[in-house]
C-alpha cells in the first residue's frame, strides 16, 4: 500500500514539476524565516544583556525603592555605619535632546569617586581624557558616546538643551564616554552621564537616589552581607 502511495505521489510530482519546486521553495523560506527570527532574537537579547551589564557594572547587589526613589542618607549610612567602601549612588531618568531626530536618552547621575570599582564612565579612553575637575564643577557638565554626540552635531564644549517631561534644561558636553569595542559602543549610544548633583537637580530628585549599587566584600558571606544591609534599610 505504501509503495503504491509513493509511486502515485511521484507520478503526480513528475507531471507537475512547478508545484514541486514551489513546495521546496516554501519549505526553504519557512526554515530561513525561523532561523532569521532566532538570530534576531539572539542578537537583541545579547544587546540587552550588554546594555544592562554596562549600566550595572560590577555590582553584585542593588538597593532600589518601592516607589522608585530612596533617601540619599542611606548611602552615607552604608559607608559610615557599615563601613562599606564598594558602594555607588545612582540617579536615573530619561530625556530627549532638543535636536532633530534625537532618540530618548537615559540620564545617569554618578559619583565619579565611587564609580571606579563599578564602571569606567569617567576613565580616559581613546576618544580623549576627561578633566574630572570640570566634570564635577562646571554646571550642567555631561558625557555622551562620541558617535552619539557626532550624529547630533555636538562637540566638547558645546551647550545643548534637553526636555524632561516638558521642562527644558541646559547641559554642556565636556567629554566622551569611553568604549573599547563596537558592542560596548552600542550599549552606551543612548546614555547621557552627569554628576549626581546635576542629575538630582535636573530630574527633580534633590535629596534622593534611584538606586545604590554594591559589591559584596570578599570577607563576608552572601547571607552576612545581605543581613547587615537589610538591618539599616528603612521599613517598607
List PLM regions with ranges:
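Alpha-helical transmembrane segments of bacterial inner-membrane membrane proteins
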Residues: 1-236
Amino acid at each position: 500500500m505504501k509503495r503504491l502511495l509513493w509511486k502515485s505521489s511521484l507520478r503526480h510530482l513528475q507531471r507537475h514539476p512547478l508545484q514541486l519546486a514551489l513546495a521546496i521553495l516554501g519549505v526553504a523560506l519557512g526554515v530561513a524565516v525561523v532561523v532569521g527570527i532566532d538570530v534576531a532574537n539572539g542578537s537583541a537579547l545579547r544587546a540587552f544583556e550588554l546594555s544592562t551589564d554596562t549600566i550595572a557594572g560590577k555590582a553584585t547587589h542593588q538597593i532600589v525603592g518601592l516607589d522608585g526613589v530612596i533617601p540619599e542618607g542611606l548611602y552615607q549610612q552604608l559607608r559610615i555605619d557599615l563601613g562599606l567602601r564598594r558602594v555607588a549612588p545612582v540617579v536615573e531618568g530619561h530625556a530627549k535632546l532638543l535636536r532633530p531626530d534625537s532618540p530618548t536618552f537615559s540620564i545617569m547621575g554618578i559619583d565619579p569617586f565611587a564609580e571606579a570599582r563599578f564602571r569606567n564612565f569617567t576613565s580616559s579612553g581613546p576618544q580623549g581624557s576627561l578633566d574630572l575637575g570640570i566634570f564635577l564643577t562646571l554646571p550642567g557638565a555631561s558625557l555622551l558616546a562620541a558617535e552619539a554626540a557626532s550624529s547630533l552635531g555636538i562637540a566638547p564644549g558645546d551647550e545643548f538643551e534637553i526636555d524632561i517631561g516638558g521642562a527644558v534644561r541646559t547641559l554642556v558636553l565636556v567629554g566622551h564616554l569611553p568604549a573599547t569595542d563596537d558592542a560596548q559602543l552600542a550599549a552606551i549610544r543612548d546614555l547621557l552621564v552627569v554628576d549626581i548633583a546635576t542629575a538630582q537637580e535636573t530630574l527633580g530628585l534633590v535629596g534622593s537616589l534611584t538606586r545604590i549599587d554594591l559589591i559584596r566584600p570578599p570577607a563576608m558571606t552572601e547571607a552576612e552581607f545581605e543581613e547587615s544591609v537589610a538591618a539599616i534599610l528603612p521599613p517598607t
